Amino acid sequence: MKNKSKKRLILAFSMLLALLSLPSCLKKDDTTILINNPQDIPLITGFLPSDLLAQFGEQNVHFGDQPPVIDMEFVSQHEYVSVTTSAPSFPPPGTVSPIAHYHKINQQYLQIAEYLSMSSEEAYCNVISPVYLTGHGNDFTVYYHESPQTDGSPEHAVLFSGTLTADGVKNFMYGYKILRYNDSVVPITAYPVNTIFVFKDRDGLAEKTNWYNDSLVHR
């Protein structure tokens, strides 16, 4: 009887240790990403306008619920691919923008991340959270809505995609649609609502870099 009691005590103690160690197994580390509740992830086909997805190109949208783990800073140089406006101020396709675009993705869960962006013309970066990811293998697509930052600035539906490599993001594509402006006065220099822009990186690789520090965040 004593041996049976001792065995039960050892078994109970082992189960207690297992339960106590469980939370540490669920924490995010370099090799572990929490599994999302699928209800938390809006489908890209319902979240973004269909005409934006069509203009971006189905071949450039990477579908799947197993995107790569992304924790990277990279920079892209945009080349104009297409735009759905005849505004004379818009450069023709093939024109490379002189403005560098900086990106940082901090993946918090399998399909949810914090995204930080800045252009070489800005003094601080924009923090957008959450953004959503879809993809498989090393191919991914990030998609989100960007709210107006100032009076007269637009709300955008945005996506960008590519293939994660050790050097950055290969086959980088970026597109957005102007959904609305946040006040009744639209600047005369602004592009009209529903305009869609699509860009690619000028040499096909948005290069890995280190650009971010806390002082760049607008508080």
Q: Which positions does each model-derived feature cover?
A:
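Short, hydrophobic/aromatic-rich segments at coil-to-beta transitions
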Residues: 70-73, 110-116, 135-143, 170-172
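C-terminal motif of bacterial Sec signal peptides marking the signal peptidase cleavage site
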Residues: 21-24
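Glycine-rich, aromatic-bearing surface loops/beta-hairpins
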Residues: 157-219
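Generic short beta-strand segments
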Residues: 75-83, 117, 141-149, 174-181
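Short, surface-exposed coil-to-beta transition loops
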Residues: 95-99, 125-129, 152-160, 172-174, ...
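Amphipathic/hydrophobic helical signal segments and adjacent flexible N-terminal regions
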Residues: 26-89, 204-219
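N-terminal glycine/threonine-rich, aromatic-flanked beta-hairpin/loop signature
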Residues: 80-130
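Bacterial N-terminal signal peptides that target proteins for export
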Residues: 2-13
